[in-house]
UniProtKB/Swiss-Prot annotation:
ADP binds at residues 212, 225-226, 275-280, 576. This is Nucleotide-binding oligomerization domain-containing protein 2. LRR repeats lie at residues 764-785, 789-809, 817-838, 845-866, 873-893, 901-922, 929-949, 957-978, 985-1008. It comes from Bos taurus. Pattern recognition receptor (PRR) that detects bacterial peptidoglycan fragments and other danger signals and plays an important role in gastrointestinal immunity. Specifically activated by muramyl dipeptide (MDP), a fragment of bacterial peptidoglycan found in every bacterial peptidoglycan type. NOD2 specifically recognizes and binds 6-O-phospho-MDP, the phosphorylated form of MDP, which is generated by NAGK. 6-O-phospho-MDP-binding triggers oligomerization that facilitates the binding and subsequent activation of the proximal adapter receptor-interacting RIPK2. Belongs to the NOD1-NOD2 family. PROSITE patterns: CARD, LRR, NACHT. Palmitoylated by ZDHHC5; palmitoylation is required for proper recruitment to the bacterial entry site and hence for proper signaling upon cognate peptidoglycan detection. Palmitoylation promotes localization to the cell membrane. Palmitoylation protects from SQSTM1/p62-dependent autophagic degradation.
Length: 1013
């Protein structure tokens, strides 16, 4: 009773201790009490209710323990003391039996140690338990609710194991045995703890506000952050016809993927075009870590900006890099550094903007000493290779064009940041505009102007639309179509806000620009100098040299650089790299110092630095070009190709007829503008013709094919920015190809608009292949103007839904030339079936429809079959990787029985059994045109094969029958052999991956060589 009396007198202090920490700490106390059988399972359930205030739960716990007597009170006191001391739970005993006859009891008695071991692995274990059928999707989603930490998710999984009687507890015992033993935290000394705390504080302060795109206001990142589409990048050439679309990840799954280019590497590469949200993604990662909400497997996070790193000219060591250029330890720096060296697996380093690092990656110079000074590029390259801090995880962001093959050798996983989905655009605008009706009006505007909607898939454009929403909604101006239109709109917005009120009524007229022309030219000269010298952050001295003063800075286009070491002077940078390119283009368009002849460097595809020798000897090539140092030509020659492409597109837009008249009133000589326009026009036309001349001749019997590269796409975008039909017509008048291939080229909606603007002037029909891009529904809409010159359109793996395809089909019905559509690996469902059926019924010259790897079921197949009944032209129908089942197979077979033109039918992986096989067999008896039937990866089995054998015996057209992976035994094979005796037409029957023994395979192979086993 004495212990109980003491317990009662300390009740208020115990309540305070229990509620002073987090819910995580409270639950760890429950773990200890449950494992020691102080609490029964019923007690625990009443104390672990989600959503209850922790103070309420604490008082209920004290009441429960009081009723258990002295021993219970002593155990609770001990558990609270252990939690206060942050002592680690004991590890699982060496006598641990993963095959225990009482698995649920063992999970409970060792619960604290099991929670600790599951920490860091709970997501993988959850996936495994769901795959094995132990828990449902609903239960998985409940456990993965965002409010739960990893430890809390582990506890919820253990709770399920206690109440489920389906073998989950036994399965978890075995899983836990295989998990690695967690490292005991070696970071108990005060210096290390204080450093971790300081790191979190510094990174939280740097990450909390999103000011990269706006110098006028600070946006709270948590309030506006919107997930981008993040996909695992496939290797070019590795995607087979049946491969599924790339996996889409959430940010918190950044390190969870098992798709590795190089399992020995430590670097995760995130690629994305300028404005796709790479920097913001890293900023959100940093904030999640600093606030303790994610990525807690890392105890140390070190963020770096490549554009700032390249400014470091003095040799430095890794220790200097981490401490002096990120965060300095206030206590025991040597002890802290030793901990970092001893435990690199607890470290995450992020490097943002590798495309802005002027040094080209090389793995020739090896540097392994963490305390020896070396150049900043050597330090970075050896960190990425793992020569320094091996096993520390690194995240590197870059534009795709800056990533070389030699760098990719050291990449563990490559992820592609695609920008916003349509849902993401809406979510972002609603977060930015919470006033009633504003977001709705903006979204209506976007949906009514597909060109602007297409631009908004890049977050930088969504920000611009949000920033300029008043101009877009209230002033009645024509909606922007091109990138240049959008940047001129944001320029107008900033100028109006910096101008006296009377000027605000004049719009973006000559007076508004002319009044700030000196400022714009100062910024333009600084931007161009920065591009030419690969400088993207500017010191006060550099600003002074460019004559940029405080009045120029007041416009807001230059903002303080992020990730600056505390206590140092922050340099300035443009809002975004695209703004730097825009101002450089503005300077090139209006400055009297710009010779028109120098503009050719913007549009040359074969620049000297593109050759291997030029990369080795860049200074030699620059001298050989005889450009005066600091001249426009010299700066353009020194700029990175991807920045030249953006600048060239902006210049083309500024010199377009629409915008040239605006700029002419700010320029003393209109003749100078016309000269520059003429130079850009000639350069674009010449560069395109060089592309066309480089096309190899067609192979005998094949159409002439052009595999375009991203550089070609930028030339097309520049033509689109100029918005001149005559120039587009002249540019492609000599393009004589039958097949234009633009796969893996980063084609999004904006690029689709540019392609359609130019390609619609082709004189001959072309097969346009846009596989493995980011076209989406909006991009499909942008392509419609050029559909009339397409004889085939390939849109594999482009995130297209029913809405986009229905619009495409509606337009295709009026396009006589279009004969082939390839739409596999998208998001199509039964909702598009009526449109597809109408296409087949109405276009009697249509030859090929490929719909593989979508989400079409029997209902969709039945609708499509209606169109097939009246079609007399289709030769290829691809349905692999859907879910048509037996009913869908029956509907298709009934429609194809009398079809006179179909030669190839694929129903691979459609869950077709013997019933569907019987229907297809009846179709084979009637159809005398089909030459290849693909039924791999179904459930045909012997019964279905016997039906097919009967149909085969009466068929005289089929040449190839594919039945691999269908659970067929020798019984089914014997039926096929009997049918083959009566059929001389069939050339191949595929039976690989079925249930034959080695002896049966050898025997069957000798009986008929047409059986491929």
């Amino acid at each position: 009773m004495c212990a109980q009396d003491a317990f009662q007198t300390q009740r208020s202090q115990l309540v305070e201790l229990l509620v002073s920490g987090s819910l995580e700490g409270f639950e760890s106390i429950l773990d200890r009490l449950l494992s020691r059988e102080v609490l029964s399972w019923e007690d625990y359930e009443g104390l672990s209710l989600v959503g209850q205030p922790i103070s309420h739960l604490a008082r209920r716990l004290l009441d429960t323990i009081w009723n258990k007597g002295t021993w219970g009170c002593e155990q609770l006191t001990a558990a609270v003391r252990e939690a206060q001391a942050d002592s680690q739970p004991p590890e699982l005993p060496s006598s641990w039996d993963p095959h225990s006859p009482h698995p649920a009891r063992d999970l409970q008695s060792h619960r604290p140690a099991i929670v600790r071991r599951l920490y860091g692995h709970v997501e993988g274990v959850l996936d495994l338990t769901q795959q094995r059928g132990f828990i449902s999707q609903y239960e998985t989603d409940e456990i993965r609710r965002p409010i739960f930490t990893s430890s809390q998710r582990a506890r919820r999984l253990l709770d399920l194991a206690t109440v489920k009687a389906n073998g989950l507890a036994a399965f978890l015992l075995q899983c836990i045995q295989e998990l690695p033993v967690p490292l005991a935290l070696p970071f108990e000394d005060a210096a290390c703890k204080k450093y971790v705390s300081k790191l979190r504080t510094v990174i939280s302060a740097q990450s909390r506000f999103l000011s990269t795109y706006d110098g006028a206001e600070n946006l709270c990142l948590e309030e506006v952050y919107t997930e981008n589409v993040l996909e695992i990048q496939m290797e070019v050439g590795m995607a087979g016809p049946s491969q599924q679309s790339p996996t889409t990840l959430g940010l918190e799954e950044l390190f969870s993927t098992r798709d590795h280019f190089n399992k020995e590497a430590d670097t995760v590469l995130v690629v994305g075009e300028a404005g796709s949200g790479k920097s913001t993604l890293l900023q959100q990662l940093h904030l999640l870590w600093a606030s303790g909400r994610a990525f807690q497997e890392f105890l140390f996070v070190f963020p770096f900006s490549c554009r700032q790193l390249q400014c470091l000219v003095k040799p430095l060591s890794m220790r200097t890099l981490l401490f002096e250029h990120c965060c300095w330890p206030d206590l025991g720096p040597q002890d802290v550094f030793q901990v970092l060296l001893d435990h690199p697996e607890r470290i995450l380093l992020t490097f943002d903007g590798f495309d802005e690092f002027r040094f080209r990656f090389t793995d020739q110079e090896r540097h392994c000493c963490p305390t020896a000074p070396t150049s900043v590029q050597s330090l970075l390259f050896n960190l990425l290779q793992g020569n320094l801090l091996k096993n520390a995880r690194k995240v590197l962001t870059s534009r795709p064009s800056a990533v070389s093959a030699s760098l990719r050798k050291h990449v563990r996983t490559e992820l592609s940041l695609k920008g916003f989905s349509e849902e993401g655009i809406e979510l972002y605008l609603r977060k930015r505009h919470r006033e009633p009706g504003v977001a709705d009006r903006l979204l209506c505007l976007l949906r009514a102007t597909s060109a602007l909607h297409g631009l908004c898939h890049l977050p930088v454009f969504s920000w611009m639309v949000s920033k300029c929403h008043e101009e877009l909604l209230l002033q009645g101006r024509g909606s922007p179509k091109t990138t240049t239109d959008m940047y001129l709109l944001i320029l107008r917005h900033f100028l109006l806000h910096a101008s006296p009120l009377p000027l605000a009524t004049h719009g973006l007229g000559p007076s508004l620009i002319q009044g700030r022309l000196p400022t714009l030219l100062h910024l333009g000269r600084l931007a161009l100098w920065g591009l030419g010298t690969c400088c993207y952050v500017f010191s006060a001295k550099q600003l002074q040299a460019a004559h940029v003063d405080s009045e120029d800075l007041s416009l807001g286009f230059l903002v303080l650089a992020k990730r600056v070491v505390p206590g140092s002077t922050a340099p300035l940078e443009f809002l975004h790299i695209t703004f730097q390119c825009f101002f450089a283009a503005f300077y090139l368009a209006l400055s009297a110092d710009t010779p028109p002849s120098s503009l050719r460097h913007l549009f040359q595809d074969h620049r000297p630095e593109s050759s291997p020798l030029a990369r080795v000897l860049p200074k030699l090539f620059l001298r050989g070009s005889r450009c005066r140092e600091g001249s426009v030509a010299a700066l353009l020659q020194g700029a990175e190709p991807h920045n030249l492409q953006i600048t060239g597109a902006f210049l083309a837009g500024l010199l377009s007829q629409e915008h040239r008249s605006l700029l002419a009133e700010c320029q003393a000589s209109e003749t100078a503008l016309l000269r520059r326009w003429d130079c850009v026009r000639r350069c674009l036309t010449r560069s395109l013709r060089e592309h066309f001349r480089s096309i190899p001749p067609a192979l005998p019997g094949e159409a002439k094919s052009m595999h375009a590269l991203p550089g070609f796409l930028w030339l097309i975008r520049s033509l689109y920015e100029m918005q001149e039909e005559r120039l587009a017509r002249e540019a492609v008048c000599r393009l004589n190809v039958g097949h234009l291939k633009l796969t893996f080229c980063g084609v999004g909606p904006a690029e689709c608009a540019a392609l359609a603007f130019v390609l619609r002037h082709l004189r001959r029909p072309v097969a346009l292949q846009l596989d493995h891009n980011s076209v989406g529904d909006i991009g499909v809409e942008q392509l419609l103007p050029c559909l009339g010159v397409c004889k085939a359109l390939y849109l594999r793996d482009n995130n297209i839904s029913d809405r986009g395809i229905c619009k495409l089909v509606e337009h295709a019905l009026r396009c006589e030339q279009l004969q082939k559509l390839a739409l596999f690996n998208n998001k199509l469902t039964d909702g598009c079936a009526h449109s597809m059926a109408r296409l087949l019924a109405c276009k009697q010259n249509f030859l090929a429809l490929r719909l593989g790897n979508n989400h079409i079921t029997a209902a969709g197949a039945e609708v499509l079959a209606q169109g097939l009944r009246t079609n007399n032209s289709l030769q290829f129908l691809g349905f692999w990787g859907n879910q048509v089942g037996d009913e869908g197979a029956q509907a298709l077979a009934a429609a194809l029985g009398d079809h006179q033109s179909l030669r190839w039918l694929s129903l691979v992986g459609n869950n077709i059994g013997s019933v569907g096989a019987q229907a297809l067999a009846l179709m084979l008896e009637k159809n005398m045109a089909l030459e290849e039937l693909c039924l791999e990866e179904n459930h045909v089995q012997d019964e279905g094969v016997c039906f097919l054998a009967k149909g085969l015996a009466r068929n005289s057209s089929l040449k190839v029958l594919k039945l691999s992976n269908n659970h067929i035994s020798s019984l089914g094979a014997e039926a096929l052999l009997r049918a083959l005796e009566k059929n001389d037409t069939i050339l191949e029957v595929w039976l690989r991956g079925n249930t034959f023994s080695p002896e049966e395979i050898e025997k069957l192979s000798h009986q008929d060589t047409r059986l491929l086993l």
